[in-house]
Amino acid sequence: MAKILVERRIKALVIACNTATTAALPFLQSMLPDLPVLGVVVPGAQAAVAATRNQRVLVLATETTIAAGAYQNLIKAQCPKAVVNTQACSVLVALAEEGMTDNPVALEALKHYLGNFTTEDTILLGCTHFPVFKKALEHLVPEGVQVVDSAQATAQALKELLRQNELITMSEGVGTIHYLVTDSINRFQRVGAIFLGTSLNAEAIELVDAC
């Protein structure tokens, strides 16, 4: 997929998945030395460190991301005294893709995952599926606990990266969005609408062979 995107003359590449970032970021950065390549883990870790006041952070992520240890290592590298706890929340991925983000099933799952953690003042959403649960989480956690979205932090990091490389467009016009997918267009329309909060035009979606 990266090759296809480069052929489309992109000016920056974001690996918008925590698991893929831990697995592929160094490789893609070495393969594409002339292209700014950004993952979601470093911006997320930086945002968590900036947010925490008691240096106790809970990372909600997939088992693969947690096993890689990237968030734990990056947070502790920036804040050596930090206590970083982790919770694998694989069920949330399926719930998110079904649009079940604020119903009783989702709330019970969130309560289950949060049950053993009471001292952290910062919760880092370490999976790009999880921002759809942010509002529900904020209602469940005690007042003062901050829920940090690694995706939002990455968007800010991308803006700064583009600025540093003088790649920010000066046009005041409204841009267009084109989606390249490797699976069902219909499924992408359904699931994408959940995450983006708006319906997706099928004409803007292109099925490509990334093999």
Question: What spans do the regions from the language model cover?
Answer:
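Non-catalytic structural scaffold of enzyme domains
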Residues: 1-211
